[in-house]
């Protein structure tokens, strides 16, 4: 067993910082007031281009235990929704930023919550960013539930780009993209 950072903020933020240290990155989210939150912030601060001033503290840091089948590479995630489940549209920066990458739809309950005007709180956050001229990216998490078609389309309306795997794409569209191990083509 080993400890690794993960999630949209850590994965996308650190990858961009490694690719081009001149890109200014604002990490936005919540981490716990615990050792795991301290560790996460310390790791992000190792990158001078990552600004963590929009990361708030409270509760217990969220985490996932990931089980991987070596023979097939299949992964199963067991997630504890902790501090990052507090994230709301009000937590996002209001200044004009060139790109907003929001992840993950179907994992952040506050952002998946209903909004009278936009459908979901995540859709509201993306719409507000677009209104300021920000390019928006929606990242979706894999799950086995039936919420893909009821939650994701609201936010999808306000996403310039979409990060999904084939399973997520099929679930959002209501299509089965595979027949056994064969990818369907129509």
Regions found by a protein language model. Give the residues of each.
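Glycine-rich phosphate/adenosyl-contacting loop at the front of the ribokinase-like
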Residues: 1-26, 35-45
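Ribokinase/PfkB-type carbohydrate-kinase core domain
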Residues: 30, 38-57, 62-186
């Amino acid at each position: 067993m080993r400890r690794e950072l993960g999630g949209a903020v850590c994965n996308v933020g650190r990858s961009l910082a490694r690719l081009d240290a001149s890109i200014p990155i604002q990490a936005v989210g919540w981490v716990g007031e615990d050792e795991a939150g301290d560790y996460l912030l310390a790791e992000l601060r190792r990158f001078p281009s990552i600004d963590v001033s929009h990361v708030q503290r409270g509760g217990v840091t969220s985490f996932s235990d990931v089980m991987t089948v070596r023979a097939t590479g299949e992964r199963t995630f067991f997630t504890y929704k902790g501090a990052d489940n507090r994230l709301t549209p009000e937590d996002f920066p209001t200044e004009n930023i060139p790109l907003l990458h929001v992840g993950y739809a179907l994992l952040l309950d506050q952002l998946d919550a209903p909004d009278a005007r936009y459908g979901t709180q995540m859709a509201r956050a993306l719409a507000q960013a677009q209104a300021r001229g920000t390019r928006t990216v929606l990242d979706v998490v894999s799950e086995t539930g039936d919420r893909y078609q009821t939650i994701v389309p609201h936010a999808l309306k306000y996403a310039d780009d979409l990060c999904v795997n084939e399973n997520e794409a099929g679930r959002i569209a209501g299509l089965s993209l595979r027949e056994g191990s064969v990818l369907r083509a129509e």
